[in-house]
Design a protein with these regions (language model features):
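Cytosolic-side transmembrane-helix boundaries in multi-pass membrane proteins
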Residues: 1-17, 218, 225-232, 300-349
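Single transmembrane alpha-helix segments in multi-pass membrane proteins
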Residues: 27-31, 46-101, 117-136, 277-283, ...
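Short, non-helical or kinked segments that cap or interrupt transmembrane helices
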Residues: 33-37, 74-91, 132-141, 212, ...
């Protein structure tokens, strides 16, 4: 069964992507364009040259952070839907440090990043504490905290840190902006995200603490019987996942957007949840999924310019990938589906 489960986790996303592109090609053909040509420009727009590759990595960076946030929390069996709010809180604190505290250069960058991570972790801990000590539903709490964080950001860029008559904050000083990564349009935030993904993978699958955290996520009752501190791991999962999202928000501010403005987070939190589910909560696979979705978004611009196919076709492909993958992975967990494989294995034996 374990081998069948692994095959399903690999097979279903791959087939979902292929079917989604096939449906996208049919839609493009119905619109009167050449599907192969459109998809070729979609690829070129994302990976065709160094500039486009850097843009893809830059667009993937915040998605990687929110995907890793969801992967880590869900591995412990807690549903942190507040990645976007934690992302925003991290950016708010980084913006305050960057514009109001006279620390520049590497110390300034590190201070902003640390403030973002701490802020995101503490913001997530609100939901964790309410779940552990009051029995509240973490999904509802984290969604509510998303709205609060968004409204708080609005107060920041329209009042507290407003720059002139425009509802936005001042740009962060050049001294704390992130340097580029290998001369690409992406910044060093991209390799930082990759390193964090590797660290999460190592922690979850190569340490005893990570094993206990996953055990709590798989069966909290059995973990409690074996003496695991359930509260400790639940709170830790909220704190760490929130810190990851908060760090992502801080680095997005310092490396790409440079100021707080309406639409800063751009739905990164819920995108991360969807990508984590597609990746079956595996941090390394989550990185690949985030880059894939970023490539679709970046490449769709060239596809539209060259062939006239609107970028909404790329959005349709993304939505289909999510629906097919999540539905397929849910289906293989149904008892009837599992029994089918069990009977097949017995017949072969």
């Amino acid at each position: 069964m374990k081998r069948n489960d692994f095959a399903a986790r690999v097979f279903i996303p791959v087939v979902s992507i292929l079917v989604s592109f096939l449906i996208g090609a049919v839609i493009i053909a119905i619109m009167g364009a050449n599907p192969l040509e459109a998809l070729q420009y979609l690829w070129k727009g994302a990976f065709g040259n160094v500039r486009n590759l850097g843009t893809t990595f830059a667009r993937a960076t915040p998605l990687i952070f929110t995907t890793l946030c969801a992967c880590f929390a869900y591995r412990c069996g807690v549903f942190n839907l507040g990645g976007e709010g934690q992302f925003i809180i991290g950016a708010i604190l980084a913006c305050f440090i960057a514009t109001k505290v006279p620390v520049t250069g590497v110390p300034g960058i590190l201070l902003c990043a640390a403030a973002g991570a701490v802020g995101g972790g503490l913001w997530a801990m609100i939901a964790g504490l309410l779940k552990v000590y009051r029995g509240q539903n973490e999904m509802i709490i984290t969604i509510m905290l998303n709205y609060i964080a968004t409204l708080l950001m609005g107060v920041v860029y329209t009042n507290w840190l407003r720059d002139g008559n425009i509802p936005q904050t001042a740009a962060v000083p050049d001294e704390v902006k992130l340097p580029s990564f290998l001369g690409l349009r992406a910044t060093i935030a991209f390799p930082v995200a990759l390193i964090i993904g590797l660290l999460i993978f190592y922690y979850l699958f190569s340490t005893s603490s990570g094993f206990r955290l996953r055990a709590v996520g798989l069966n909290a009752t059995a973990a409690k019987v074996n003496g695991f501190n359930i509260r400790h791991y639940v709170l830790m999962s909220f704190a760490v996942s929130g810190a990851i999202a908060g760090l992502g928000g801080a680095l997005e501010l310092l490396g790409t957007q440079f100021r707080l403005i309406n639409g800063f987070a751009a739905g990164y939190g819920f995108d991360g949840v969807a990508m984590a589910l597609i990746a079956s909560l595996h941090p390394l696979t989550g990185i690949l999924v985030a880059v894939f979705f970023a490539a679709l978004r970046v490449g769709s611009t060239m596809m539209q310019t060259a062939t006239g196919v609107p970028t909404s076709v790329s959005d349709i492909i993304q939505a289909l990938v999510i629906v097919f993958t999540v539905a397929g992975l849910a289906m293989v967990r149904l008892p009837a589906f599992r029994n089918l494989f069990t009977r097949k294995a017995r017949k072969e034996a």
